[in-house]
From Swiss-Prot:
This is Serine--tRNA ligase. It comes from the Bacteria. Its main location: cytoplasm. L-serine binds at T237, A238, E239, E291, S391. It comes from Salmonella arizonae (strain ATCC BAA-731 / CDC346-86 / RSK2980).
């Protein structure tokens, strides 16, 4: 959520920055609501002061032996007016907050302006796509050859966009997640976490999934039902529970950065993706991901974004997978991001690069929703932290890339060297 003071005092400047990412801020409506808020605020404060003054007069009149009943009736009437004014003010503040919750983050100045993914800017490439001297098989064909990917069984169990993995393919999928976790915890300084896969609505508001993206989630009960202890949603990413671990916390600045990682399944309805990537593992309702989250001082967040992106890149480099790094344009960034790098891995059967990691600096956008703050050791003042998140990596898409890039002419799949210790020294699948 954006700083309310910024929205009140500099709405035109905010609107100009939001326009860069294709969001139209209704400045006139905000101004009208703000003027109404000021009027109601003053009215409420005046009624409160008047009621306090008249209440005090009751005691004084009583001490003088005067009839206090007229004063008591007046105080009661003022109390009713005050309650009505407070209710009106609270309703208006709720309306303003509801609007604020739908406004995306401001883009950083260095983010390229653009409309969609076609305007993203390539930053660098690593590795050279392999030239095959045989007909390339896609991961679905390879998986079926080795009885490792069974989409028909998943349709029977659940429906489309799910998969059953078996045998050495399932083992490689597990090996990838273990390798990623070990790399991030042993070399990159992250602490491993095991988190719930079901979270409450407060948690989803904290990281920005609610209210705007309710339709992208799997809910245990209809969202319109009153929230209670049994009203949950499945996590779309481990970013949600990991980041919310600091909700309503005040952290000493010398404890920062906090670097966390977790391997979880992720659940997404893919509501806007009908007809896209219907074959294979690229776009699933349920997929595994190793997530990275950092909680940092505000002045450190841009450097932390570069570091985190480098950690995701290291996974691809050690696996020997060609990839490219791009910076997302303003129109393609996620709702809460101020700056995002995507890593796209080479997928031979599609003859193109596909997203495998997204690393974002969220600034104080989530921290303000969560009231996550840090305290200076010198003056004890508190301020909002900055939060960052990144995929390190999406496990299913990494499996796709390994299967296709390491395939052999006879259909076998070479196991990358860094994965062999996790697969009992196995060199080839098949």
């Amino acid at each position: 959520m954006l700083d309310p003071n910024l929205l009140r005092n500099e709405p035109d400047a905010v609107a100009e920055k939001l326009a860069r990412r294709g969001f139209k801020l209704d400045v006139d409506k905000l101004r009208a609501l703000e003027e109404r808020r000021k009027v109601l605020q003053v009215n409420t404060e005046n009624l409160q002061a008047e009621r306090n003054s008249r209440s005090k007069s009751i005691g004084q009149a009583k001490a003088r032996g005067e009839d206090i009943e007229p004063l008591r009736r007046e105080v009661n009437k003022l109390g009713e007016e005050l309650d009505a004014a407070k209710a009106e003010l609270e309703a208006l503040l709720a309306e303003i907050r509801d609007i604020a919750l739908t406004i995306p983050n401001l883009p950083a100045d260095e983010v390229p302006v653009g409309k969609d993914e076609n305007d993203n800017v390539e930053v660098s490439r690593w590795g050279t796509p392999r030239e095959f001297d045989f007909e390339i098989r896609d991961h679905v064909t390879l998986g079926e050859m080795h009885s490792g990917l069974d989409f028909a069984a998943a349709v029977k169990l659940t429906g489309s966009r799910f998969v059953v993995m078996r045998g050495q393919i399932a083992r490689m999928h597990r090996a990838l997640s273990q390798f990623m976790l070990d790399l991030h915890t042993e070399q990159h300084g992250y602490s491993e976490n095991y988190v719930p896969y079901l979270v409450n609505h407060d948690t989803l508001y904290g990281t920005g999934q609610l209210p705007k993206f309710a339709g992208d989630l799997f809910h245990t009960r209809p969202l319109e039902e009153e929230a209670d202890s049994s009203n949950y949603a499945l996590i779309p990413t481990a970013e949600v529970p990991l980041t919310n671990l600091v909700r309503d916390e005040i952290i000493d600045e010398d404890q920062l950065p906090i670097k966390m990682t977790a391997h979880t399944p992720c659940f997404r309805s893919e509501a806007g993706s009908y007809g896209r990537d219907t074959r294979g593992l690229i776009r699933m309702h349920q997929f595994d991901k190793v997530e990275m989250v950092q909680i940092v001082r505000p002045e450190d967040s841009m450097a932390a974004l570069e570091e985190m992106t480098g950690h995701a890149e290291k996974v691809l480099q050690l696996l020997g997978l060609p990839y490219r790094k791009i910076i997302l344009c303003t129109g393609d960034m996620g709702f809460g991001a101020c700056k995002t790098y995507d890593l796209e891995v080479w997928v031979p059967a599609q003859n193109t690069y596909r997203e495998i990691s997204s690393c974002s600096n969220i600034w104080d956008f989530q921290a303000r929703r969560m009231q996550a703050r840090c305290r200076s050791k010198s003056d004890k003042k508190t301020r909002l932290v900055h939060t960052l998140n990144g995929s390190g990596l999406a496990v299913g898409r990494t499996l796709v890339a390994v299967m296709e890039n390491y395939q052999q002419a006879d259909g076998r799949i070479e196991v990358p060297e860094v994965l062999r210790p996790y697969m009992n020294g196995l060199e080839y699948i098949g």
